[in-house]
Amino acid sequence: KEYLAKKSVWIFGGDGWAYDIGFGGVDHVLAQNKDVNIFVFDTEVYSNTGGQASKASNIGQVAQFAAAGKEVKKKSLAEIAMSYGYIYVAQVAMGANPAQTIKAISEAEAYHGPSLIIGYAPCEMHSIKGGMTNCQAEMKKAVECGYWNMFRFNPAAEAGKKFILDSKAPAGGYQEFLMNEARYSRLTREFPERATVLFQRNEDAAKERYEHLLKLVDMYDGK
């Protein structure tokens, strides 16, 4: 055994696969409690098949099959995985915090069991102002305004360090962030009144999500 290197198994896929059409398989693999790692590139849309809405798409987002803006919030894949209690789970955004991304990957690799890392991944379907050259900056904005949260759940960590919330409290500018991407801003031109309602629901859901993550910090800290 001393001459055999440890196998490192990583599976990479998009949100359409992990959240939606391949979710049953992803869930089955994670539930087996084997030493396998899954990295999901979360673009919040079916990027490779024409831009259809997926269960990772967010409230008010315009996509195929959601031309008037998606009405319901996105699925919480991370928390579904966390509910097992023995899966390493992290959400990352490289443009916002490269060190946190590397740390999550390192921890997942070192963890003796299944792991799931979900990375925020801007894509052409988002139609970011200035184009994809701004995708790293867009990740940072997403985290700063509270649209995307970064955290790490490590079942093997000591008490008080099992759940680490790496995101700071939202700094504002949420609606401005949405308007910087045509996947949202186009709704204001086509259905302005509906856009106002859905975008506010999107922001409210983000606030609730952050408050929930704070409660998870307290819960795993034993407070």
PLM regions and their residue ranges:
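Structural signal for hydrophobic packing residues in well-ordered secondary-structure cores
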Residues: L30-K34, E44, M82-Y88, I105, ...
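Conserved thiamine diphosphate
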Residues: Y3-A5, S57-Y111, M179-R186, P192
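Acidic, Ser/Thr-rich peripheral helices and adjacent loops at domain boundaries
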Residues: A53-K75, T133-F153
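Thiamine diphosphate
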Residues: K1-Q52, V89, G95-H112, R186, E193-V197, ...
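Glycine/aspartate-rich loop-and-adjacent alpha/beta segment that forms the canonical ThDP
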Residues: T101-V197, R201, E211-K215
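Short C-terminal domain-edge/linker segments immediately following a structured domain
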Residues: F41-V45, A68-V72, A121, G146-F153, ...
